C-alpha cells in the first residue's frame, strides 16, 4: 500500500524513514508513535529544517555514502533529522501529502523489515542503509508546536478553530488490511491532531486532556467508520465494537498503550540499525553499547541473531574499519565476538602507530566481570582482552590458515618485550603462562574461534616456506610485491599486501633479520623454521629453545596445545605507520573487491561481461577500478566448472589423419538405428550401417532385433564381404558404447579377428559423426521416398536400401568422385533404375487357370542385390518378389493413392472377372490381423506381410491400394495414428512389444506372439482417457461416430461408440487375498484414534449389532449413531445367514497366493494391460462373419498358388508375453459394405430394402446441403491431402429397419485438415447412471429424444473434398463439403460445439462443470450422447418446452415422452430400462443378449444345466507355452476378441459383478489355450443363463433429507504377477449401485494395508467428482461415505503420526488420503469382509459367497 503511495508521489525524493515496532516484531515504513508533545515539537522543527536542506540525487548517479557513517558534517550542514512526522507529511495547503507517509533519504535505502532478522537475509550491499528512526520518544501526544504550521487550541476554542483548519486537513488513508491497523491508527491520530482534536486523544492513563463533545464524538465515529472498514479491523477492535459500536476512544486508548510499550524496543532497533563507528571512541565502549542493546532485545523476546547483528555493525563501520565489510561478508557463521576482536585489533594498531605506546587494554579485573552471552551461541563467550576461558584446542597442521575461507580471524599483537627465563615450558592453558611477571601481558586478544592460538606469540611452522605476520608495525623496509603467490595448506591463494624484514632482538643482545610477508588473511602469525635455519637459528624441541648452531640459547619455546610458539617480545617494532604499510600495495588487493567475490555476487558471470557492465554504469555503487582484476584471467571457479560443464570441442578436419593413415576398407564406422514401431512382425525394426573412412562407401543391413547373435551375424557377413570382394582386412571399427557393441560376444569376435574396437566417449555423439550423419541422411531419404510414393511404412527399409544404392554412386563435392569409384566399382546404370514406388505390372508365372489374368499390379522398390532383377512389392499378395518379368505402367503416377479402384466396386462384370482376387483381398488384406506370410526367393523381405495400413494418401494413415471392393473400414472406430499408444505397461518387459511378439518364419526360435490386433500403424492401441477423470473425459464416440449415425449405435453392435466406455480399463485380477490384519478391539482402535479435525470423531459407538460397522469419522453436529445408520440404511448389503456359514469366505481371503513366482497367473491374469470394450481400428475384418471366413479360406485353398502360399508353421505362445501384449478388445463388425449389402446380396428382399435406405440417405444429404451441388472439381486440381475417400455402410437395426450411411474415411484424413485440439464429448456413463438414480428418487419424468442427421447441422470450416456417391458415376470428380460429414475427425467436435451453444443460448441451459454433455437449468437436466438426448424433469411441461425449442432448429424425434404413470420401457444407449415413476427402475439387456449371444457360435448349455457363478476359486491358468498352428491361433484370438468384447460391454453397462472375471480373461486374449477358451465359454454361458438379471433400484425414502453417496472398497493383496494387488470399488447413490471398477494396483504393495490404502485412494477422486455432480443436479445436502474392511487402513487415516513411512509411494498416498478424508467431509466406516460387496471385484468367490454378496442389488 505504501509503496503504491510512494510511486504516486514520486516528485518527493527525500524524507524521513519511519518504522513501527509492535511487541516482538518489526514493521516497515512507520515510526513508533511519539505521544509526547514536547518531543513532537522538537522533531517537527528538526524535520522542517532537514527537508529544506535536502537535495535530489540524480537517478543515474552512484548512491552517496550515508552521512551518518562518515565523519561529522560541518555545522552549517546539519545531518538529516528523523522526526516522527516530517514537515512534508503535515496536511497543509502547500503540502498535499497525507499524514503517515514515509520517504527515504537515499534511493538505495531499504526499509527494515522483520525478514531482515532472518539468518537467511543478505542486504544488497555494504552501503545499503536502514531507515533513520527517531532518537527519543516521550509522553502522550498533545498539540504540536507553532512551527508545525498548525495551531491547536484548548477545548473552548476547538470548535471555532476547526472550521478554519479543516480546509487544510487531508483525510487519512483507507485501512486495507488488519495487519496495517497499527500504522493506520497513527495516521488517524495525526489526522485528529491536524483537525484541532488533539485534546481528545487519550493519554497513557487512557483519559483525554479535555472532555469530548457530542459533535466531536459523532465526528470521531463517522471518520473511523469511513476510513476503517469493518472487514479490515483486527479482532480485538471488533471485540470492542461488538460491545459498544461507538467506543472509538477505547480503541485509541488501547492503541496508544500498545505503542507506548513498544517505544523502548523501537529505540533499540533504531539505534542498532544506525550504528556508526570510525575509531574515534574506544572499541570497548562501542562493544559495550552494542552488546547492551542486543542483550536488552533478547530479553524482550526480539532475537537478533549473530548474522544480522554482524551485518548491522558492519554497515556502520567507516574509515580503517570499512574493509571488514568485505573480508567478513562471506563468513556465514561469524559471531559478534569475532567481529569485535577484529575491531579491537584495528583500533589497537591505530593507537600503537599514532601514540607509540602500549595497546589499549582493559583491566584484568574488568575483563573477568565483563562476560556476555550472544544469541545463537551454544555456550557463553567471554568478550574481553584477557578472556577467562578453558582450552579446547584441537590438533591442527601447522600451516598458514586462510581466514578468507574459514571462520578464524586474526588477533592483535602484543609488542611488549621483557626478559624471561629459558626453561622449557609446557602450558596446559594459555592463562598458565609463566615467563616472568612481564609475560602475563602476552595473553591478550584471545580469538573466540581460535582456541588453539597463543596470543602475543609466533607459531613455529616447520612446513611453512615463508614467514607471514598480520601486524603491520613489526615490518621493516616494507615494499609492494604483488607478484608473490602464497597458498595455504588447502591450496587456496593468500593475498599478500607487502614484503619486508622481520627483525629479532634476542636475549643475548644479538639481532637477526628474516624476510616476512604481511597479510591480514591468516589465523596465526607464522614463523618459518626454514627461514630461521637460513640465518643459523634452529629450534630444539627437547630443551624447548631457539639456539644457534654453537648452542647459544636465543629464546624459549612455549608449547601450547599441539603447537610450539615463540614470544613476539623479541620482535623490534618498525617506524612505519599502519596507514603507510596498508597502502604499500596501494590498496590493490586488501582495499579492492577481490574478483572471486564479485564473480560470485554477480551470478558467476565472466570477467569480460562484468568489466563491460561496470564501464557502462549498468552496475552502480562501485567502479571498475574498485575491483582487483589481477586474478581474473587465471581464476578458475569450481562451481562454474561443475555447473557450466560442456563437451570438448571437435576440431574441424580432424578425421583427415585417419584417411591418410589407413587404406580403403581398413577403418569402418558403424551405428544402429531403431527401433521403428508399429510394423508387422516380418518387417525389420532396425538397420545397421557401415561406412568406410577412406572411400565413404556405405552398407546397410536390416535387423529385427539388437541381440548379440544378430549383430554378430552382420559383422561376420560384412567382414567376409570386404575380405573376398576387396581383398582388404578391416583393422579398426569405430562405434558407440551401446550394449550391442560392448557385449562380450562381439568383443571376443573382434579380438579373434585382430580388429581394434574404437569406442566413443560417454555422451559424445559428435565424435561418432560419420555414422550418425549417414543414418540421418538415410532416414531423411526414407521419409521422402515413402511420402512421394505413398507406400506403406513397413517398406521403410526398402527405401533405405534404395537410398544407399543411389548415394554410393553420387560424387562427393570434396573428392569429386563417388564412393563406388573410390572403391573401384562401376557406376550406376540409371537405365536400370526405376523411381521408388514406380507402378509396374508383374507377370504371374503360375496362374490359377488359363483364363486367369496374368498380370499383378506392383510397385518397384530397388535393384536386387542377389540378381539382375528388381525388388517389386505386390500389395495384393502382401509380398515382395525379385523378378525381371515386369512392365512399367506408362503415364501412371507413382502414387498408390492416385489409383481409382472405386469404379471396380460397382462394375459387376469386372468384379466377376476378379472375384478370386476380391476374395483373396477381402480375407487377407482388409482384415485387421496380419494373416498371411507369403514367401518368395527374395532374401530378407520375402516374408513381409502387408501392414493393415494400406498405401496411403500423401500423409494419410491408410488407404486400400486396389479398392476393388469398398473398404471395410468401420470409421466409427477409427483413430489417428498419433493417438495410438503402443507402449507397454510399466511392469511389462521392455523387450516384449507388439512388433516382436510373434517371430517370422526365419526367427521362429524366439518365442513371440503375433501382433493380432493391428491398427493403422501396425500395432494395438488403447484410449488414454481415465475412467476416474470425468472433468477431462474425452470419449471417442463423438469423434469416431462420424462414420455412422445413432441408428447404427442402436443396432446390435456393442462397440466403443455405443458404450461410452473406452475410458474404462479392465485390469488383470485374480488370486486370493493374504490379509494379516491384527485383531484389534473396537476399544483399542478408539484409543489409537486422535481427533484430527471437527469432522472426525474419535469415539465411535461401542455397539452396532445391526450391521457390525465401526464408524470412523462423523461430524460433531450429528450423532455418530444417526450418521452411521443414515449412510448404511439403504445399502444393498447381504443379510447374515441364520447360522454362521463355513469360514470359507474369510479363510479364503486369508489364503496366501498359491503361486509365488513373479510370473504367477491366477484367474486374475497377467500384466497391467487394459482391456476396453472396443478398439479403434483402421479396417474391419471379414472374420466377424463366420460365412465370410469359410469363403475366404476356400478361395485361398482353391487358388492353389503354390508359389505364393505360406507354409503352415507352428507358433510358440508364452503366457507372460501374450498377457503383456494385450492392449484392447476387438469389437464385432455389424455393418456391411456396399458390395455385401447390394452388389452381391443374394437376398432380394433385403437388397431392395438396402437400396431404399441408400436413396433415403442420399436424399437426406442433399436436403441438409451437405456439399456444394453447383460445382464438381477435377481430382487432379485439388491438393491430395484435402481429398477424403468416402464409402457406404449398411446396417439392420434391432427394430428391423434397414439403414444406410454415407461416410467419409476419417481414418486417412490428413492432420492439417482438422484441429487436433478439438474434443468431441459424450455423456459419461456414471453421469447417466447418476441422473437416472436421481430421477427415480425425485419422481422425474424421463424423455428420450433423437436428432436426425445431427452432424450435418454443424458447418465445417476447413476446405475438404470427397468423392461423390457411387450411383452418380463420377469417380474422377470431387465435391466440396459444406457440413460436418460423418466420419470426419472434426465432425464430432463441431456438432458438440453447435448443440452446446444452442442449449446454452436458446434453451437456457448450462453445462455442469467437469461433466461434459450434462446440461441443467432450474427445472430440466439433459444428458447428451451425440444425437441422443435424455431429459429429466419433475414437470413434464418443462421437457416439452425444451423439445419445442429444439424443433425450431433441429429435426427432433420423440422416442419416448415418458408421460405415463405406468411402467415405461426405454432403450437408452444399449440399456433396456423399465421405469415406473415413484416406485422402481430396472436396468438390463435381456433382449440384446438373447439376440447376440447365439451368434457367437458358443456351445450353450452343453450339459443341460445352468451355471451359478461365472468362475471358480482356486483355478489357475496353466503357464506352459502354447504351441499352435498360426491360422488356428489367429482364429482363436479373433474368437476371444469377440467374446470378451461382448462381455466387457455388458459388464461396464450394468453387470458389475462380472468385472473381475472379464478383466481376468481380457489379459489372456493373445493366449487362447484350451483352458482360457473354456473359462471364456463358461463366462458367456453364465451371462446367457443370467441374461434376464437386472440391476434393481427402488425409490429412496421420501423422508430422507440428504443424498448419500457411498464407495465400498476392497483389495486382494499380492495375487497378481509381479506381486501386484487387485483393487475394486463399487459406488452407490442413495443405496443404488451406479458403477464399479476392478483394476490392478499400479504400485507393488508390500502388505495388505498398503493394498487397501491404494484401493481407498483410487475411490476418493471419483467419489468427489460424483459428489459435485449430485450437488449440481440436486440441491439437497449430500453425505459422502467410504466403507472398507481394513481396520489398519482406518487407523492410518485417523492417525496424526507423521513419521516417515516405509516407502515414499505408500507414504504419499497415505498422507494424501488423510488430507482428502479430513478436507472433504468424508465419513469412513469399517465393514465386515463377509458383507463387503466389493469383494466380488477383487477375487473369484465360491458360489454361495458370490450369491450372498450380489443377490441384493442384481437379480
Curated annotation (Swiss-Prot):
Residues 660-829 form the Integrase catalytic domain. Residues 1338-1476 form the Reverse transcriptase Ty1/copia-type domain. Residues 1610-1752 form the RNase H Ty1/copia-type domain. Residues 1-93, 126-173, 352-421, 956-1087, 1092-1111, 1129-1172 are annotated as: Disordered. Residues 299-401 are annotated as: RNA-binding. GO terms for biological process: DNA integration; DNA recombination; proteolysis; transposition; viral translational frameshifting. Initially, virus-like particles (VLPs) are composed of the structural unprocessed proteins Gag and Gag-Pol, and also contain the host initiator methionine tRNA (tRNA(i)-Met) which serves as a primer for minus-strand DNA synthesis, and a dimer of genomic Ty RNA. Processing of the polyproteins occurs within the particle and proceeds by an ordered pathway, called maturation. First, the protease (PR) is released by autocatalytic cleavage of the Gag-Pol polyprotein yielding capsid protein p45 and a Pol-p154 precursor protein. The active site is at residue 461. Residues 583-640 are annotated as: Integrase-type zinc finger-like. The keyword Glycoprotein does not apply. Residues 48-60, 127-152, 1005-1015, 1053-1082, 1101-1111 have a biased composition (Polar residues). Mg(2+) 1 binds at residues 671, 736. The C-terminal RNA-binding region of CA is sufficient for all its nucleocapsid-like chaperone activities. This is Transposon Ty1-LR3 Gag-Pol polyprotein. It comes from Saccharomyces cerevisiae (strain ATCC 204508 / S288c). The gene is TY1B-LR3.
Amino acid at each position: 500500500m505504501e509503496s503504491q503511495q510512494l510511486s504516486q508521489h514520486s516528485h518527493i525524493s527525500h524524507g524521513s524513514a519511519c518504522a513501527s515496532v509492535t511487541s516482538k516484531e518489526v514493521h516497515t515504513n512507520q515510526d513508533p508513535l511519539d505521544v509526547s508533545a514536547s518531543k513532537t515539537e522538537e522533531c517537527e522543527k528538526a524535520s522542517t529544517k532537514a527537508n529544506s536542506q535536502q537535495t535530489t540525487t540524480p537517478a543515474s548517479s552512484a548512491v552517496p555514502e550515508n552521512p551518518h557513517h562518515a565523519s561529522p558534517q560541518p555545522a552549517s550542514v546539519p545531518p538529516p533529522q528523523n522526526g516522527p512526522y516530517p514537515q512534508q507529511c503535515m496536511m497543509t495547503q502547500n503540502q498535499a501529502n497525507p499524514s503517515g507517509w514515509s520517504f527515504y533519504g537515499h534511493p538505495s535505502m531499504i526499509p527494515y523489515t522483520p525478514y531482515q532478522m532472518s539468518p537467511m537475509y543478505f542486504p544488497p550491499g555494504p552501503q545499503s542503509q536502514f531507515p533513520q528512526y527517531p532518537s527519543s520518544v516521550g509522553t502522550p501526544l498533545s498539540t504540536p508546536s507553532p512551527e508545525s504550521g498548525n495551531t491547536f487550541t484548548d477545548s473552548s476554542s476547538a470548535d471555532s478553530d476547526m472550521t478554519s483548519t479543516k480546509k487544510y486537513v487531508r483525510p487519512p488513508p483507507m485501512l486495507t488490511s488488519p495487519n496495517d491497523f497499527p500504522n493506520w491508527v497513527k495516521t488517524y491520530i495525526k489526522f485528529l491532531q491536524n483537525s484541532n482534536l488533539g485534546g481528545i486523544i487519550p493519554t497513557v492513563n487512557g483519559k483525554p486532556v479535555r472532555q469530548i463533545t457530542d459533535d466531536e464524538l459523532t465526528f470521531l465515529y463517522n471518520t473511523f467508520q469511513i476510513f476503517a472498514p469493518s472487514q479490515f479491523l483486527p479482532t480485538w477492535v471488533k471485540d470492542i465494537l461488538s460491545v459498544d459500536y461507538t467506543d472509538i476512544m477505547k480503541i485509541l486508548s488501547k492503541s496508544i498503550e500498545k505503542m507506548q510499550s513498544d517505544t523502548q524496543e523501537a529505540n533499540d532497533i533504531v539505534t542498532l540499525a544506525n550504528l556508526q563507528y570510525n575509531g574515534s571512541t574506544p572499541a570497548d565502549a562501542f562493544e559495550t553499547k552494542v552488546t547492551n542493546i542486543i542483550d536488552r532485545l533478547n530479553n524482550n523476546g526480539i532475537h537478533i541473531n549473530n548474522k544480522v547483528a554482524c551485518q548491522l555493525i558492519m554497515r556502520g563501520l567507516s574509515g580503517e574499519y570499512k574493509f571488514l565489510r568485505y573480508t567478513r561478508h562471506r563468513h556465514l557463521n561469524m559471531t559478534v565476538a569475532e567481529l569485535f576482536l577484529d575491531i579491537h585489533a584495528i583500533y589497537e594498531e591505530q593507537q600503537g602507530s599514532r601514540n607509540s605506546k602500549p595497546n589499549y587494554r582493559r583491566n584484568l579485573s574488568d575483563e573477568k566481570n565483563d562476560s556476555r552471552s550472544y544469541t545463537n551461541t551454544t555456550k557463553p563467550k567471554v568478550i574481553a582482552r584477557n578472556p577467562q576461558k578453558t582450552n579446547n584446542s584441537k590438533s591442527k597442521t601447522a600451516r598458514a590458515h586462510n581466514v578468507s575461507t574459514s571462520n578464524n580471524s586474526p588477533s592483535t599483537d602484543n609488542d611488549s618485550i621483557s626478559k624471561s627465563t629459558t626453561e622449557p615450558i609446557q602450558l596446559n592453558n594459555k592463562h598458565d603462562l609463566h615467563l616472568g611477571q612481564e609475560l602475563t601481558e602476552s595473553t591478550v586478544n584471545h580469538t573466540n574461534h581460535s582456541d588453539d592460538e597463543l596470543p602475543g606469540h609466533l607459531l613455529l611452522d616447520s612446513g611453512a616456506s615463508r614467514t607471514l605476520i598480520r601486524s603491520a608495525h613489526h615490518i621493516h623496509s616494507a615494499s609492494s610485491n604483488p607478484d608473490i603467490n602464497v597458498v595455504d595448506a588447502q591450496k587456496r591463494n593468500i593475498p599478500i599486501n607487502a614484503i619486508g624484514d622481520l627483525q629479532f632482538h634476542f636475549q643475548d643482545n644479538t639481532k637477526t633479520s628474516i624476510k616476512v610477508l604481511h597479510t591480514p588473511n591468516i589465523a596465526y602469525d607464522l614463523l618459518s623454521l626454514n627461514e630461521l635455519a637460513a640465518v643459523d637459528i634452529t629450534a630444539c624441541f627437547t630443551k624447548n629453545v631457539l639456539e644457534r648452531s654453537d648452542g647459544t640459547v636465543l629464546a624459549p619455546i612455549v608449547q601450547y596445545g599441539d603447537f610450539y610458539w615463540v614470544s613476539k617480545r623479541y620482535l623490534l617494532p618498525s617506524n612505519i605507520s599502519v596507514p603507510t604499510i596498508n597502502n604499500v600495495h596501494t590498496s590493490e588487493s586488501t582495499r579492492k573487491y577481490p574478483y572471486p567475490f564479485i564473480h560470485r555476487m554477480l551470478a558467476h558471470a565472466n570477467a569480460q561481461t562484468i568489466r563491460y557492465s561496470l564501464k557502462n554504469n549498468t552496475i552502480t555503487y562501485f567502479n571498475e577500478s574498485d575491483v582487483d582484476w589481477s586474478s581474473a584471467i587465471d581464476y578458475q571457479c569450481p562451481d562454474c566448472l561443475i555447473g557450466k560443464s560442456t563437451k570438448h570441442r571437435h576440431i574441424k578436419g580432424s578425421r583427415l589423419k585417419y584417411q591418410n593413415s589407413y587404406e580403403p576398407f581398413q577403418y569402418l564406422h558403424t551405428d544402429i538405428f531403431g527401433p521403428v514401431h508399429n510394423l508387422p512382425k516380418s518387417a525389420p525394426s532396425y538397420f545397421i550401417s557401415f561406412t568406410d573412412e577412406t572411400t565413404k562407401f556405405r552398407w546397410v543391413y536390416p535387423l529385427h532385433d539388437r541381440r548379440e547373435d544378430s549383430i554378430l551375424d552382420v559383422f561376420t557377413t560384412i567382414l567376409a564381404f570386404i575380405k573376398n570382394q576387396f581383398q582388404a582386412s578391416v583393422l579398426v571399427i569405430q562405434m558407440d558404447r551401446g550394449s550391442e557393441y560392448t557385449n562380450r560376444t562381439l568383443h571376443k569376435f573382434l579380438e579373434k579377428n585382430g580388429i581394434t574396437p574404437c569406442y566413443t566417449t560417454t555422451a559424445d555423439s559428435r565424435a561418432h559423426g560419420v555414422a550418425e550423419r549417414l543414418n540421418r541422411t538415410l532416414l531423411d531419404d526414407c521419409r521422402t521416398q515413402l511420402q512421394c510414393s505413398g507406400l506403406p511404412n513397413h517398406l521403410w527399409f526398402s527405401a533405405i536400401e534404395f537410398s544407399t544404392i543411389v548415394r554410393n554412386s553420387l560424387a562427393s563435392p570434396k573428392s569429386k568422385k563417388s564412393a563406388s569409384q573410390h572403391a573401384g566399382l562401376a557406376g550406376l546404370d540409371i537405365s536400370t533404375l526405376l523411381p521408388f514406388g514406380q507402378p509396374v505390372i508383374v507377370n504371374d508365372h503360375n496362374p490359377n487357370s488359363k483364363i486367369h489374368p496374368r498380370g499383378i499390379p506392383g510397385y518397384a522398390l530397388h535393384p536386387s542385390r542377389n540378381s539382375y532383377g528388381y525388388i517389386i512389392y505386390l500389395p495384393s499378395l502382401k509380398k515382395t518378389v525379385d523378378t525381371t518379368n515386369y512392365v512399367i505402367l506408362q503415364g501412371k503416377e507413382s502414387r498408390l493413392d492416385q489409383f481409382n479402384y472405386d469404379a471396380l466396386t460397382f462394375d459387376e462384370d469386372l468384379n466377376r472377372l476378379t472375384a478370386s482376387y476380391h476374395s483373396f483381398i477381402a480375407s487377407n488384406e482388409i482384415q485387421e490381423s496380419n494373416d498371411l506370410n507369403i514367401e518368395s526367393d527374395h532374401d530378407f523381405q520375402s516374408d513381409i506381410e502387408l501392414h493393415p495400413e494400406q498405401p496411403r494418401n500423401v500423409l494419410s494413415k491408410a488407404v486400400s491400394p486396389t479398392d476393388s471392393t469398398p473398404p471395410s473400414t468401420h470409421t466409427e472406430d477409427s483413430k489417428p495414428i498419433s493417438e495410438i499408444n503402443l507402449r507397454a505397461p510399466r511392469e511389462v518387459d521392455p523387450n516384449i512389444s507388439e512388433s516382436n511378439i510373434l517371430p517370422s518364419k526365419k526367427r521362429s526360435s524366439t518365442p513371440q506372439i503375433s501382433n493380432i490386433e493391428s491398427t493403422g500403424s501396425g500395432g494395438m492401441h488403447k484410449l488414454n482417457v481415465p475412467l476416474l477423470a470425468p472433468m477431462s473425459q474425452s470419449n471417442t464416440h463423438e469423434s469416431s461416430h462420424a462414420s455412422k449415425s445413432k441408428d447404427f449405435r442402436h443396432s446390435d453392435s456393442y462397440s466403443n461408440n455405443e458404450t461410452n466406455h473406452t475410458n474404462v480399463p479392465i485390469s488383470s485380477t485374480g488370486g486370493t487375498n493374504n490379509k494379516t490384519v491384527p485383531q484389534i478391539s473396537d476399544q483399542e482402535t478408539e484409543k489409537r484414534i486422535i481427533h484430527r479435525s471437527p469432522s472426525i470423531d474419535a469415539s465411535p459407538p461401542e455397539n452396532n449389532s445391526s450391521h457390525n460397522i465401526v464408524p470412523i469419522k462423523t461430524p460433531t453436529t450429528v450423532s455418530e449413531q444417526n450418521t452411521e445408520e443414515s449412510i448404511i440404511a439403504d445399502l444393498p448389503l447381504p443379510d447374515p445367514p441364520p447360522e454362521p456359514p463355513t469360514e470359507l469366505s474369510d479363510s479364503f481371503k486369508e489364503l496366501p497366493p498359491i503361486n509365488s513366482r513373479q510370473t504367477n497367473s491366477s484367474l486374475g491374469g497377467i500384466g497391467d494391460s487394459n482391456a476396453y470394450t472396443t478398439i479403434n481400428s483402421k479396417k474391419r475384418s471379414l472374420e466377424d462373419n463366420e460365412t465370410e471366413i469359410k469363403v475366404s479360406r476356400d478361395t485361398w485353398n482353391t487358388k492353389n498358388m503354390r508359389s505364393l502360399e505360406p507354409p503352415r508353421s507352428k507358433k510358440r505362445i508364452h503366457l507372460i508375453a501374450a498377457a503383456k501384449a494385450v492392449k484392447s478388445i476387438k469389437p464385432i463388425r455389424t455393418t456391411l459394405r456396399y458390395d455385401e449389402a447390394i452388389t452381391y446380396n443374394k437376398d432380394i428382399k433385403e437388397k431392395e430394402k438396402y437400396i431404399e435406405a441408400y436413396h433415403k440417405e442420399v436424399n437426406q444429404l442433399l436436403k441438409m446441403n451437405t456439399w456444394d451441388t453447383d460445382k464438381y472439381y477435377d481430382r487432379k486440381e485439388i491438393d491430395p491431402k484435402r481429398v477424403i475417400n468416402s464409402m457406404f455402410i449398411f446396417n439392420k437395426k434391432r427394430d428391423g429397419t434397414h439403414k444406410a450411411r454415407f461416410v467419409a474415411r476419417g481414418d486417412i484424413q490428413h492432420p492439417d485438415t482438422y484441429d487436433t485440439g478439438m474434443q468431441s464429448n459424450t455423456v459419461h456413463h456414471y453421469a447417466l447412471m447418476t441422473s437416472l438414480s436421481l430421477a427415480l428418487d425425485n419422481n422425474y419424468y424421463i424423455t428420450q429424444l433423437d436428432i436426425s442427421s445431427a452432424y450435418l447441422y454443424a458447418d465445417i470450416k476447413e476446405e475438404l473434398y470427397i468423392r461423390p456417391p457411387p450411383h452418380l458415376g463420377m469417380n474422377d470428380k470431387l465435391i466440396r463439403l459444406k457440413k460436418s460429414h460423418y466420419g470426419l475427425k472434426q465432425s464430432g467436435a463441431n456438432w458438440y460445439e453447435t448443440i452446446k451453444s444452442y442449449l446454452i443460448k436458446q434453451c437456457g441451459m448450462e453445462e455442469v462443470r467437469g461433466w461434459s454433455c450434462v446440461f441443467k437449468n432450474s427445472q430440466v437436466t439433459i444428458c447428451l450422447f451425440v444425437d441422443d438426448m435424455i431429459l429429466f424433469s419433475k414437470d413434464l411441461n418443462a421437457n416439452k418446452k425444451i423439445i419445442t425449442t429444439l424443433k425450431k432448429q433441429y429435426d427432433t424425434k420423440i422416442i419416448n415422452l415418458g408421460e405415463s404413470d405406468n411402467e415405461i420401457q426405454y432403450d437408452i444407449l444399449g440399456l433396456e430400462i423399465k421405469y415406473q415413476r415413484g416406485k422402481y427402475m430396472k436396468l438390463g439387456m435381456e433382449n440384446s443378449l438373447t439376440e447376440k449371444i447365439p451368434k457367437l457360435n458358443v456351445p450353450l448349455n452343453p450339459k443341460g444345466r445352468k451355471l451359478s457363478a461365472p468362475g471358480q476359486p482356486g483355478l489357475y491358468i496353466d503357464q506352459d507355452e502354447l504351441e499352435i498352428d498360426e491360422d488356428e491361433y489367429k482364429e482363436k484370438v479373433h474368437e476371444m476378441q469377440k467374446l470378451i468384447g461382448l462381455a466387457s460391454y455388458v459388464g461396464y453397462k450394468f453387470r458389475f459383478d462380472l468385472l473381475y472375471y472379464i478383466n481376468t480373461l481380457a489379459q489372456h486374449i493373445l493366449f487362447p489355450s484350451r483352458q482360457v477358451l473354456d473359462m471364456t465359454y463358461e463366462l458367456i454361458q453364465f451371462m446367457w443363463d443370467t441374461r434376464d438379471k437386472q440391476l434393481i433400484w427402488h425409490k429412496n425414502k421420501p423422508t430422507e433429507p440428504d443424498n448419500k453417496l457411498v464407495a465400498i472398497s476392497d483389495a486382494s493383496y499380492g495375487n497378481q504377477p509381479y506381486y501386484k494387488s487387485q483393487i475394486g470399488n463399487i459406488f452407490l447413490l442413495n443405496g443404488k449401485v451406479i458403477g464399479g471398477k476392478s483394476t490392478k494396483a499400479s504400485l507393488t504393495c508390500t502388505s495388505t494395508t498398503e493394498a487397501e490404502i491404494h484401493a481407498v485412494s483410487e475411490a476418493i477422486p471419483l467419489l468427489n467428482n460424483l459428489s459435485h455432480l449430485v450437488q449440481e443436479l440436486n440441491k439437497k445436502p449430500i453425505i459422502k461415505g467410504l466403507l472398507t474392511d481394513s481396520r489398519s487402513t482406518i487407523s492410518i487415516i485417523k492417525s496424526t503420526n507423521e513419521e516417515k513411512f516405509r516407502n515414499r509411494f505408500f507414504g504419499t498416498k497415505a498422507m494424501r488420503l488423510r488430507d482428502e478424508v479430513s478436507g472433504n467431509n468424508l465419513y469412513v466406516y469399517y465393514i465386515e469382509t463377509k458383507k463387503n460387496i466389493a469383494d466380488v471385484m477383487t477375487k473369484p468367490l465360491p458360489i454361495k459367497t458370490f450369491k450372498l454378496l450380489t443377490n441384493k442389488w442384481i437379480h
